[in-house]
From Swiss-Prot:
Its EC number is 3.2.1.23. PROSITE patterns: GLYCOSYL_HYDROL_F35. It comes from the Eukaryota. It is an enzyme of class 3 (hydrolase). Keywords: Apoplast, Glycoprotein, Glycosidase, Hydrolase, Secreted, Signal. The gene is BGAL2. GO terms for cellular component: apoplast; cytosol; plant-type cell wall; secretory vesicle. The keyword Hydrolase applies. Induction: By sugar starvation. It catalyses: Hydrolysis of terminal non-reducing beta-D-galactose residues in beta-D-galactosides. It comes from Arabidopsis thaliana (Mouse-ear cress). This is Beta-galactosidase 2.
């Protein structure tokens, strides 16, 4: 590239960047078939998803800064209903859920915001973002032409819009919000819902438009989105997408930069060459707004993860879970954004002229009176190609696009990575933990907090998702004449559960454990159990691992033991215990005593030093530690533990489950060719998640309280505090 062209290019880019900052005054946001129009100017916009609750407020400024430095124009986020309205009419907009603060930080950085209100979000988030209390509103049917649902949805949507209006955060008020989204990926659900789904979709659109935000509304994966709402694309590739009207621009709301990690699954990785290829193809085919989902994934703190979703929501994003740059992904995409901006005058002025050079090569040229940009594409997955353009040869690697912002100089090729690869590693700190333990144990059926019902009950209807844990108790009375007492053929206990994990205790001892998976959260426990003459105490601890975040008829989804529960091998054959009298208890003793807090943990006696138990189920552990020096992100290495939850200074850093090892086929990864979430997997046979992020803002200089609840039984002596840093 000539020095003259490079200098000229940087001047143009600087002018474009400066113009993007000028939106602190009131502006008009419209659109035509080419692009969004802001203050009368068509824009090519690069966006990235950063979900505010998946990091801490202290992390937000740096994440937004890195997004801007990476070449983004827009930050995109969902709005998380269950975080903002934990109980009907009681709203929460503080700490990690301070949406207004997050939006203002985006504005201060000179970026726009795409506000996806939903309020259904999916997002691998607990219950898809819906508050669980919504399920128990009389007559409730989710996401269809149902009056109770529409009333609740409209109320929350209006709450968010009114709040943002009051803070003057829409672009037309001088704020950063240039787009709002209503519903989310409803198109596939609409067909399943039939006429009621169609009516609901129409109502949703009309309701949103009636809120008068002054900026365009969008609906993703909604082919029949009515005018003026823009229908948008989600997927790994969207170059072939066309909106449902020639008067609407081509917007891509989710370009998946990787994929989520599930407990029991391998870690997905999407090569940056393929991401860049997908973006270039979208732009060369007339796309004008592209959002990376995710640009920063973050962490599913607390119990916010969807069913079987790992605590880490890293997503193989350009900024990793800890807020560090993932290289070369971040820098390679940054260079792509620079060259797209250099092409912007041509891209927004004309439609492309397309020349086919065979089955697998194409040239897209955008030529106006004052500018020219060309995209040279090679779709072959195995062979490079040399193409001639305007009398000059250009060499294109397989599965790549070269971009010429002056129709002459190759500034960028999607498969030619110039940025260095920087590998991150977890380095143990000098922190030494001195552990104390407290035995949760199996409670009795007559202790405080238990209640009795005939037959089995659904778990979430009792817990209302305030805890992962729900106990089922019953007595099994064995007569002295039972034949198995003499033969030693212990009877077979079989339990069918809607999920997600189950611990079976017989007379206070763990008899076995069973658990499901994301692909099938239901489980069956079937095991011979040892019973004695007289009354035998059966205690079943049912454990939820998040609630489903996708699908239809949320009001029908169940968790816990619904039966049948049978005992086979008694004299009379098989006992169906499902309709017996059962006792129930919500949550754990340790939860009721708030053992995860300083006050709660100080109120009970803990076993110390040589008396600390290991490999024992239902055990609480605590220790204290000082914050290591430096500013590197911190994490807990939980490799020697089984399953449970972790708290630091009262903050729940999420569910841990390192004992659930990753299945899948991990092999060589070739960037070329169509990507899907099962391609380019890593860490097969290892824990799906070993390290758990501990935000530094949650720590004190000295005396931090670390509390762990361990369900399965682990060895806390193997836990270490590590720093994440570059090799």
């Amino acid at each position: 590239m000539s020095m003259h062209f490079r200098n000229k290019a940087w001047i143009i880019l600087a002018i474009l960047c400066f113009s993007s900052l000028i939106h602190s005054t009131e502006a008009v946001v419209t659109y035509d078939h080419k692009a969004l129009i802001i203050n009368g100017q068509r824009r090519i916009l690069i966006s990235g998803s950063i979900h505010y609750p998946r990091s801490t407020p202290e992390m937000w400024p740096d994440l937004i800064k890195k997004a801007k430095e990476g070449g983004l124009d827009v930050i995109q986020t969902y709005v998380f209903w269950n975080g903002h309205e934990p109980s009907p009419g009681n709203y929460y907009f503080q700490d990690r859920y301070d949406l207004v603060k997050f939006t203002k930080l985006v504005h201060q950085a000179g970026l726009y915001l795409d506000l996806r209100i939903g309020p259904y979000v999916c997002a691998e988030w607990n219950f898809g973002g819906f508050p669980v209390w919504l399920k128990y509103v009389p007559g409730m049917v989710f996401r269809t032409d149902n009056e109770p649902f529409k009333i609740a949805m409209q109320k929350f949507t209006k709450k968010i819009v009114d709040m943002m209006k009051e803070e003057k955060l829409f672009e037309t008020q001088g704020g950063p919000i240039i787009l709002s989204q209503i519903e989310n990926e409803y198109g596939p659900m609409q067909w399943e819902m039939g006429a009621a789904g169609k009516a609901y979709s129409k109502w949703t659109a009309e309701m949103a438009l009636g809120l008068s935000t002054g900026v365009p509304w969008i609906m993703c994966k909604q082919e029949d989105a009515p005018y003026p709402i823009i229908d948008t694309c989600n997927g790994f590739y969207c170059e072939g997408f066309k909106p449902n009207s020639d008067n609407k621009p081509k917007l891509w709301t989710e370009n998946w930069t990787g994929w989520f990690t599930e407990f029991g699954g391998a870690i997905p990785n999407r090569p940056v060459e393929d991401i860049a290829f997908s973006v270039a193809r979208f732009i060369q085919n007339g796309g004008s707004f592209m959002n990376y989902y995710m640009y920063y994934g973050g962490t599913n703190f607390d119990r916010t993860a969807g069913v079987f979703i790992a605590t880490s929501y890293d997503y193989d994003a350009p900024i990793d879970e800890y807020g560090l740059l993932r290289e070369p992904k971040y820098s390679h995409l940054k260079e792509l954004h620079k060259v797209i901006k250099l092409c912007e005058p041509a891209l927004v002025s004309v439609d492309p002229t397309i020349t086919s050079l065979g089955d697998k090569q194409e040239i897209h040229v955008f030529k106006s009176k004052t500018s020219c940009a060309a995209f040279l594409s090679n779709y072959d997955t195995s062979s490079a190609a040399r193409v001639m353009f305007r009398g000059f040869p250009y060499d294109l690697p397989p599965w790549s696009v070269s971009i010429l912002p002056d129709c002459k100089t190759e500034y960028y090729n999607t498969a030619k990575i110039r940025a260095p690869t920087i590998l991150m590693k977890m380095i143990p700190t000098s922190t030494k933990f001195s552990w104390e333990s407290y035995n949760e144990g199996s409670p009795s059926s007559n202790e405080a907090g238990t209640f009795v019902k005939d037959g089995l009950v659904e778990q979430i209807s009792m817990t209302r998702d305030k805890t992962d844990y729900f106990w089922y108790f019953t007595d099994i009375t064995i007569g002295s004449d039972e034949s198995f007492l003499k033969t030693g053929d212990n009877p077979l206990l079989t339990i069918f559960s809607a999920g997600h994990a189950l611990h079976v205790f017989v007379n206070g001892l763990l008899a076995g454990t069973s658990y499901g998976a994301l692909s099938n959260s239901k489980l069956t426990f079937s095991q011979n159990i040892k019973l004695s003459v007289g009354i035998n105490k059966l205690a079943l601890l049912s454990t939820a691992v998040g609630l489903p975040n996708a699908g239809v008829h949320y009001e029908t989804w169940n968790t816990g033991i619904l039966g049948p529960v049978t005992l086979k091998g008694v004299n009379s054959g098989t006992w169906d215990m499902s309709k017996w009298k059962w006792s129930y208890k919500i949550g754990l003793r340790g939860e009721a005593m708030s053992l995860h807090t300083l006050a709660g943990s100080s109120a009970v006696k803990w076993w110390i030093k040589g008396f600390v138990v290991k490999k024992q189920p239902l055990t609480w552990y605590k220790s204290s530690f000082d914050t290591p020096r430096g500013n590197e992100p911190l994490a807990l290495d939980m490799n020697t533990m089984g399953k449970g939850q972790v708290w630091v200074n009262g903050h729940n850093i999420g569910r841990h489950w390192p004992a659930y090892t990753a299945r899948g086929n991990c092999g060589r990864c070739n960037y070329a060719g169509i990507y899907n979430e099962k391609k380019c997997l890593s860490h097969c046979g290892e824990p799906s998640q070993r390290w758990y992020h501990v935000p530094r803002s949650w720590l004190k200089p000295f005396g931090n309280l670390l509390v762990i609840f361990e369900e399965w039984g682990g060895d806390p002596s193997g836990i270490s505090l590590v720093k994440r840093t570059a090799k």
